[in-house]
Every structure is written in C-alpha cells, then in structure tokens.
C-alpha cells in the first residue's frame, strides 16, 4: 500500500475535483480510511510502471464521450477512409496508391490483444477511469470499456481496396463498421489511430510510385534495354530524417513497393512482420560517409580511395566524394586510379552530396565564355556524368545514348525531389546520356515533408442504423448520412450511405454511394479483418508486381 502522505497532492486534486469526501484542505483532517478505499478503486497497481500505453487512449479526447451522444438506439456506425484532395501533393500524383491497410490492422490488432484484452479488466479499465476522470473533471463511467473487454475482440468489419492498386481521389481505400450492436461507438473511436497510421504509408507509396513513373519514362526514352535498373535507381536514404522509428517502417516499406534499394533496415523487418516476406526484400552496397573520408585526411584522399578498393575488391562500392573538392576527385583522383578501377571486379560509384543536384550531375554553363583563370569552370559546366565519361568512356546503346563503362557510376542523395529527378533525366538526355547513368537517393526531404493533408485523407461516417421501439415491436432504421459544409469548397463533402467501389471499363475504380447492403457486400472492397480475424492477406511481392504492371503500358 502506498502511504497517503506520498499521494497527498494527487488525492487533494481528486477531492477538489470530484468531491469524493469532505475535505477542508487540512492535511491532518484527511479521512485516511476513505482515501485508501478510493485509491484502491481508482489507482490499481499504483507501484507498477505502465509498460505499454492503454490502447483505449489512442484516440482524440473528445471521442471518449461520443458513445453517449449518438441517437438512442444506435446499433451500427459505418465509416470510410478516403483521399479527398491532391491539392498539396507533388505534381503528377493524381491518384493514390492503396497501401498499408494490412500492416495497420495488424498493428491495431496486436496492440489491443497485448495491451487491453490480455490485461486484467480491472487494471486497464481502472486506468481509463482514472485518466478520463482527471481529463474530463468528472467521475467517468467505463462500463462500455468493460463490456468490450468482456467481449474479448474488436467487433469490427474492415474492407479495403487491394494493396498495390491506384485509387482516384474521392474514392475510399477502406471501410469499417461494427459487427456487434452494443459497440456502435467503436467504429469512430478508432478513427484517430487509423488515420494516424494509414496516411503516411499511403502517401509515401504514392510518391515512390511517382518517382518510378518518372524514372521509367526516361529509361524508356534513353536506355530501354536496361529496364531492370529502375528497381535500384530510387534508393531510400530517409531514415535519419524521419520523425520516429515507426515512420521508418511505414514509409520505408512504402518506398519498397516501387523500389528495391534502401538503407532503411527497419523497413525490411516490416516487410517480414506485416507482409510475410521471407526472402530478399531490399538491399544496398558498401558505402562510405564523410567521417571515413575525413579520417583518411584531405591530403591523403586518393589513398583512402585506393584502400577502400582494396578492402572491397569486388562488387559495387559507393564513395562520398565531396568531403572537400568533388571536381578534383572527378578530374584528378579517378584519372590516377583509372586502371585500378577498371581492373576491379565491380563498380565504383562517385557520390556528390552538396549543391544543386541537377547542376552537379548534369553540369551548368554559367557564362558564354569559359573563364581561363578558373580551372574548375570546365568541370562545373560538364557535371559529374560527363566528367566520368571523359575518363572512362562507355558504350552507345541502341537508342543512341551514352552509357558509362560498367566499372564507374554515380549516385546523388541530397535534396532530391520528383521535379529534380525529372530535370536530371531530361538534362542528361539532352546531353546524349542515358538516364540510367545515375542513382538517386530519396530522403526525408521527400518522405517527411508531408502531412495528412497532402492527399486530404479523412475518415467519415456515412451510414448508421437506429433501433426503434414501437408498439408493434422493434424496427431498425438505416440512415444515410453525410457532411457538406456550406463554408467549404467541396473538398470536405463526404459520400452518403453504404458504399461500393468497382472498376469501370477502363479499369479505374469508381465509387457508388447510397447502395444497399447487398451491393455493399460485393465489389472491389475486400474484407481484410473481421472480429479479430484476418482475411485476404497479401505480400509485398504481390504489391510490387501490381504496381509494376500499372506502368507496363509505358514500356511499349
């Protein structure tokens, strides 16, 4: 038993708020018996630290009262999660990649199983009573939480569009409704956490797909015989700039729906845990960072290059090359090391890491006449790819574009955007180089500078059922509901009633609202979770294949 003196301030606040007992503020006049009784009821396991957050706290505070606010007799709430707008999305992202529903439902399921249903009811519901009583300044009734614990599972039916498909704006990617009439409140109680977990993987998967679309376009124009290279041309460098380890998994896994290159190891774990992958998921190469180059000293940089090649005599080796003077590396060091690089069984990749990525890779002509007094002007005008060609040469492919010798290459991974990726490929092509001569690192500048509003994701209820008591008996009324704020431009207008999504003659998803249960039960939305059980599971491999097939028409 915790001594009352230790909890004096907590109890004082509780007494003032709840008027649980008469108390005049004098420490010596506390009724210790009543205090101890109250503590036993409201502070179970006081000496234990909470190891995991109670999942019932994973919601907006205002939702904790909504079970009392629905019309009397409510038995069902039906909601959907939908991208409503691409107003703030990168150019070209006119549709959203359906991705992450299976992962999110597994996370939600495991959290409730471990941290709610598997814990004593008195403990988890006692936590909620304590927290919400303090939060709302009332004696909060947790009977609905207790009933959920007694039920032993999440009574919800979740449907989703196939992961790896493209979804038009305003078409729902997920629907959810409760399966037990007593738990109508559960549907939208879960809105907050579902939105929190779903928007990022879908946003990142959509952006990754757009990168692949751009890179595929230029590969087709300049180097179609090396289509395999696209899997590796977009490389995930975002981990250090993401806002959490969880975000690295959700966003990093989203990147892997379109590419195989990644430095985000947690994403590979995510592919195994949430999508059942057992073999190869993603990969990278041996690569240096600035600390390695600095440790070798500026004056001995060329020896650092040589030592690295000796350490890794085979395979791809990426060397960060602008710790001091990128242009010296590209015009002097690699000239000295040329024969060693060509004799090596593998590719040495030069990695610039600062400046304007388009100009660094493609070159920049900053005046009409070269300044004869600036030895770097010629290098800056040419850019890395042309400088590597000057030293190592290469081949001319069937489409007439230059492809660097297989022993040398380049990667740039700082401040890359979809627009810059497109411009790099465009300018390389204009100079006669294949777009496949460079790998682009995609970082948090791409994957972290987004919010739920990037695609306007929102979860809204569109249908409820109300049970009415009449003299003739009990009847159930289905109400088609919607929101359409008069002060909005139409973005926030929701669908109405039960929903069905199906493909049109062009293979595009189309939404039909105000349908019957019979029509809702079929269509493209597939059940993925119902009453604690998973259905229609998929794999990352299938998702990748689906997204690649979408781009196949470009390859004709």
Language-model region placement:
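Secondary-structure transition/turn motif
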Residues: 37-40, 350, 539-540
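Residues that form generic nucleotide/phosphate-binding pockets
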Residues: 38, 107, 111, 131-135, ...
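Helix N-terminus capping/helix-initiation residues
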Residues: 60, 120-121, 141, 183, ...
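Aromatic- and Gly/Pro-rich amphipathic surface segment
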Residues: 100-139
């Amino acid at each position: 038993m915790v001594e009352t003196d230790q909890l004096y301030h907590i109890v004082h606040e509780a007494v003032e708020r709840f008027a649980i007992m008469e108390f005049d503020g004098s420490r010596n006049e506390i009724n210790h018996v009543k205090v101890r009784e109250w503590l036993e009821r409201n502070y179970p396991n006081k000496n234990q630290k909470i190891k995991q957050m109670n999942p019932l706290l994973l919601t907006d505070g205002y939702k904790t009262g909504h079970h009392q606010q629905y019309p009397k007799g409510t038995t069902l709430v039906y909601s959907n999660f939908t991208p409503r707008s691409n107003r703030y999305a990168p150019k070209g992202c006119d549709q959203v990649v359906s991705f992450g529903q299976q992962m999110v439902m597994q996370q939600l399921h495991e959290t409730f199983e471990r941290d709610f249903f598997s814990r004593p009811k008195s403990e988890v519901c006692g936590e909620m009573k304590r927290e919400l009583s303090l939060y709302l300044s009332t004696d909060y009734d947790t009977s609905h939480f207790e009933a959920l614990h007694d039920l032993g599972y999440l009574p919800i039916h979740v449907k989703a569009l196939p992961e790896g498909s493209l979804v038009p704006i305003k078409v729902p990617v997920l629907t959810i409704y409760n399966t037990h009439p007593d738990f109508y409140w559960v549907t939208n109680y879960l809105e907050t956490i579902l939105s929190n977990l779903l928007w990022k993987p879908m946003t990142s998967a959509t952006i990754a797909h757009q990168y692949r679309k751009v890179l595929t376009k230029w590969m087709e124009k300049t180097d179609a015989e090396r289509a395999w290279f696209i899997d590796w041309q977009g490389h995930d460098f975002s981990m250090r700039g993401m806002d959490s380890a969880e975000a690295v998994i959700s966003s990093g896994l989203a990147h892997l729906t379109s590419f195989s290159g990644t430095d985000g190891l947690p994403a590979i774990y995510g592919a195994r845990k949430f999508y059942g992958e057992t073999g190869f998921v993603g990969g990278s190469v041996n690569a240096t960072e600035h600390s390695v180059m600095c440790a070798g000293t500026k004056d001995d940089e060329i020896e650092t290059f040589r030592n690295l090649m000796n350490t890794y005599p085979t395979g791809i080796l990426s060397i960060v090359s602008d710790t001091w003077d990128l242009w010296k590396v590209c015009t002097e060091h690699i000239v000295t090391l040329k024969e060693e690089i060509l004799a090596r069984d593998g590719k040495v990749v030069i990695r610039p890491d600062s400046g304007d990525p388009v100009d660094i890779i493609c070159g920049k002509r900053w005046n009409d006449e070269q300044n004869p007094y600036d030895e770097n002007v010629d290098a800056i005008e040419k850019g890395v790819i042309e400088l590597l060609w000057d030293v190592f040469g290469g081949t001319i492919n069937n489409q007439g574009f230059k492809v660097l010798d297989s022993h040398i290459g380049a990667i740039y991974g700082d401040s890359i955007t979809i627009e810059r990726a497109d411009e790099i490929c465009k300018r390389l092509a204009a100079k006669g180089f294949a777009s496949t001569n460079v790998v682009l690192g995609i970082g948090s500048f791409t994957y972290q500078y987004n919010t739920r509003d990037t695609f306007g994701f929102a979860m809204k209820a569109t249908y409820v059922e109300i049970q009415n008591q009449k003299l003739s008996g009990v009847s159930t009324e289905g109400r088609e509901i919607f929101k359409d704020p008069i002060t909005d431009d139409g973005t926030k207008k929701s669908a109405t009633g039960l929903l069905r999504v199906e493909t049109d003659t062009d293979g595009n998803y189309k939404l039909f609202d105000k349908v019957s249960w019979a029509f809702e039960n079929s269509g493209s939305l597939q059940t993925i979770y119902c009453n604690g059980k998973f259905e229609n599971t998929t794999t990352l491999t299938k998702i990748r294949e689906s997204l690649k097939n979408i781009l196949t028409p470009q390859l004709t």
